[in-house]
Amino acid sequence: MIKRELYMRRIRPFLGTELIKVMTGIRRCGKSVMLELIQQELTESGVSSAQFIAINFEDMSYSHLQTAQALHDEITKRAKEIGGKVYLFFDEIQEVKDWEKCINSLRVSLDCDIYITGSNAKLLFGELATYLGGRYVEFVIYPFSFGEFMELYRSIAPDASIQQCFQKYLLAGGMPYLANLRYADAPSKQYLHDLFNSVQLKDIMKRNKIRDVDLLERIIAYVIANVGTTFSATSLAKFLKNEQRTVAPETILNYIKYCCEAYLFYQVKREDLQGKQILASNEKYYIADHGIREAVFGGNMRDINLILENIVYLELLRRGYEVTVGRTGDKEIDFVCDKRDEKLYVQVCYLLASDETVNREFGAYDSIRDNFPKYVVSLDEFDMSRNGIKHRNIRDFLLAEEWN
């Protein structure tokens, strides 16, 4: 089991506290394993596992607990039997109707430490904000980073070089279960395709009561094909009209919002770096796992530049950065990254194979006058740093402990 220390470092200070720990992320990204890791850490700190109550609401044996009252009654009864402080672990809590009322009541009435997971960003809005406002901390869990992937892949192929590991990562992505399939191509693609269908059906269509399945599938296919490119709902509406589908841009944006709430896509806003304002249109979208893209759409190697961008973007999110696309004049910076007092800029490209490419990638920083770190990241093996702008091989960049 991968320790996932990046997340445990953030969660550890909250272990045993009265704050509710909420872990969200796309289906099958490893949230259940995080609950196991937390239980393991608590046990090592002296907590008896007899004090744990763990329920996975996708398990049919708990189907009788899918209302707030039924769950509350069951947990209250079991807590009395255990006596003392109890540690509650609820996996995929969104399957329980009005679950936030139950969680709030348990928080108030029991001596307990609560951990929950869910596959929808709306988990933390609406009713939850009303009942639990200021009483929870959220941790977004992502598929494996390249470093985590390489650790597992080398347990299967111990002689694999870093280059070979990265080549596999480009196609397989970071979904944890693939290690159980030993990263075999056909079973891995089948698993990822089925996972994609499950996210589309359970977390997007059913949750949002979408009836126009064909339209949803077309919109998702379009975004997957165009990850990392500037998006316009109006342009997509025109494209669909040419295919005899008349749809309003607002409907398209709503459907994409549902996909983002299910953590299938991430939206990246564009920022005017000179005017220091977020632009209202032409955002970009990246997919939660590029392995899913390869399984359902293909073409990761053909679209290598966009896939490298996708990989770097997810790594920036993992490390806690808020990310925008920067615009300065007629130039664009792939990622402008902020985290408290930290800031850095990242340009991503496939290869710096010509003077034109070098000038474009490094020249994007010409009008940025601050002293924050500026990177150009590519698959090139040789360091081409210049004028204070750091060039890094993408593998080294992803594996670095920190960027400075």
Features from the language model and the residues they span:
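Pre-Walker A adenine-sensing motif
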Residues: 2-16
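Hydrophobic anchor at the beta1->P-loop junction of P-loop NTPases
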Residues: 23
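Conserved lysine of the Walker
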Residues: 31
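Hydrophobic positions on the alpha1 helix immediately C-terminal to the Walker A/P-loop
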Residues: 34, 38
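Short glycine-rich substrate-engagement loop in P-loop NTPases that contacts/grips substrate
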Residues: 54-84
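Interdomain motor-coupling "hinge/lid" segment immediately C-terminal to the ATP-binding subdomain
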Residues: 121, 126-230, 263
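Accessory nucleic acid-recognition modules appended to NTPase machines
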Residues: 183-343
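Catalytic cores of nucleic-acid endonucleases
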Residues: 326, 350-395
